[in-house]
A protein has these predicted regions:
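Active-site and donor-binding regions of nucleotide-sugar-utilizing enzymes
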Residues: 1-176, 180-182
Length: 182
């Protein structure tokens, strides 16, 4: 389950890797165009989950709550070997909690450790009630997850695997003035 473009990108790469290990693997859930290109049939458009901030969330609260329940029911209906949620913790961890409550033996994996080391340190302990394993992007994150009972593997950050800027791209951004990113 992915709820935003960055999760779709991570999910597509994960699906490709899993398929290389087991060509018969099947994927069911929620994702965007990249995950769909890897064979996922999305339960509903991932874009429905891409909301941020109180002003955006409030009018969609009941719809999102219904989507959480639908996603958990769909996950249970297909009897997966594992439920893999990707980032979008406000949505994904609620789905995992419902699914785990209904089927305690369900293996749950969350890809992208929440930044408990930077803010909301209690989130890891709360997350450990529903998540068995975490795939961490940063090398210092596993101890935070392991400290509350989850297993955790550092899998690396996808930015590291991307190509460096070409000489022409470097020249383009190497102007005289400061670089302002907004």
């Amino acid at each position: 389950i992915a709820g935003e473009p960055s999760g779709d990108r991570l999910g597509a790469a994960l699906m490709e890797g899993l398929r290389s290990l087991s060509p018969q693997v099947q994927f069911h859930g929620i994702g965007g165009p990249l995950m769909q290109a890897q064979g996922l049939t999305s339960l509903f458009p991932m874009e429905e989950l891409s909301v941020m901030g109180l002003v955006e969330v409030l009018p969609k609260y009941f719809h999102l709550k219904r989507r959480i329940a639908e996603a958990a029911q769909a996950a249970l209906a297909c009897q997966p070997a594992a439920l893999i949620t990707i980032d979008s913790p406000d949505f994904c961890l609620r789905v995992a909690a419902l699914a785990k409550a209904a089927r305690p033996d369900l293996r749950t994996i969350h890809y992208v450790a929440p930044s408990v080391w930077a803010w909301r340190p209690g989130r890891a302990a709360k997350m450990a009630r529903h998540i068995d394993h975490v795939l961490a992007l940063l090398p210092f994150e596993p101890p935070y997850m392991q400290a509350v009972g989850m297993t955790c593997d550092f899998v690396g950050h996808p930015v590291v695997a991307e190509a460096l800027a070409t000489p022409s791209e470097t020249a383009l951004i190497a102007g005289d003035g400061p670089l302002l990113l907004a």
